[in-house]
Regions:
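Acidic, proline/glycine-rich low-complexity intrinsically disordered segments
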Residues: 1-191
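Alpha-helical protein-protein interaction modules
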Residues: 120, 124, 130, 135-323
Length: 323
């Protein structure tokens, strides 16, 4: 176990040699730098990252605890400080508009920058803070730089596509879809802004193709992690769109059972009910999502899955057009 980072370094080098990949000086430097000297801290970090991908409030609470434990074990663990910044910024965007979340995100980001200013994951944390302030283009600029250096950087493509979607650049999201899916590996979140953008562009055939791939990704993931409520809620929406109403209701019900007070689960349920043409249930779920903390008007108004609710007084009250 003591040589785990040396083994990772050697594996990365062997793969590069086997594929005849030319490694840049920056990449060589990155391979040579250990993220932390503490294996226990690294274990906490990886566990936290797994929870963080699920994006529900409870899972983010778990991830924040894991990342906090990691920096307690190694105060110089820049990736863990950056991960804390990401989680705090996401909390602010979707669950709690208290300025203290952004203050905490900024403090964690500053610690990460002070330790490792050029590490891609640290730059993603800076982008999350910009995103939380609605500075989508500035965030996207940072994320493009990150991706140019490390295509598979955790969460980079997902946040870039979110920025582009929120700023109405649907065609650009569509153009990045294949690269984003390939680079994001098992992170199913990347499918969300892609499907939303293809829906906004009315590219039905392309959307159905991506939808089938998203279904396969969720089904494979849930065989490994059956308690992932977010994945189930997203799968419910996919099933609804593909004409599988019973499967859709089953997954939506399971998701809400697993996380009954989660704004993201309720929001996705609203999208699912819209797809099933059940307007009253959709409005009810969306109102619950708003009360639970989902108050992102840019996202809700741009989401084609909620088109059924546009013009409804309750929808307009909850998610008004920004001045």
């Amino acid at each position: 176990m003591a040589d785990v980072f040396e083994v990772q370094d050697e594996i990365a080098r062997k793969i590069a040699e086997a594929l005849r990949i030319k490694i840049t000086p920056q990449e060589k430097e990155a391979l040579a730098v250990k993220p932390t000297e503490s294996l226990q801290a690294y274990d906490h970090y990886l566990r936290g990252r797994s929870y963080a991908r699920r994006l529900t409030r409870q899972d983010l609470d778990f991830s924040l605890q894991m990342f906090s434990d990691a920096v307690a074990l190694d105060p110089e663990f820049a990736l863990a400080h950056a991960a804390i910044a990401n989680v705090c910024a996401y909390f602010f965007c979707h669950y709690d508009r208290e300025p203290s979340w952004i203050d905490r995100a900024r403090a964690a980001s500053e610690k990460a920058v002070a330790l490792r200013p050029d590490v891609p994951e640290v730059m993603v944390a800076q982008a999350w803070i910009l995103y939380s302030r609605g500075e989508y283009l500035d965030a996207a600029r940072i994320l493009r730089s990150v991706i140019s250096r490390k295509r598979d950087c955790e969460g980079a493509f997902y946040l870039l596509l979110r920025c582009l979607f929120a700023s109405g650049q649907y065609q650009e999201v569509a153009g990045l879809a294949e690269e984003a899916i390939e680079a994001s590996g098992t992170d199913y979140n990347v499918y969300v802004p892609i499907l939303n953008s293809l829906g906004a562009l009315a590219k039905t055939e392309s959307r159905n193709n991506i939808m089938q791939r998203a279904i396969q990704a969720h089904e494979a993931h849930l065989r490994e992690v059956p308690e992932d409520a977010r994945s189930r809620s997203l799968l419910a929406g996919c099933y609804a769109d593909m004409g599988r109403p019973e499967d859709s209701k089953r997954e939506a019900t399971m998701a809400m059972t697993l996380r009954p007070n989660e704004s993201s689960i309720l929001y996705n349920a609203a999208c699912t009910f819209c797809s099933l043409n059940e307007k009253a249930d959709a409005l009810d779920a969306l109102a619950k999502a708003w009360r639970a903390g989902f108050k992102d008007s840019d996202w809700a108004r741009g989401d084609p899955d909620l088109a059924l609710l546009h013009g409804e007084p309750e929808f307009e009250r909850l998610y008004p057009t920004k001045a």
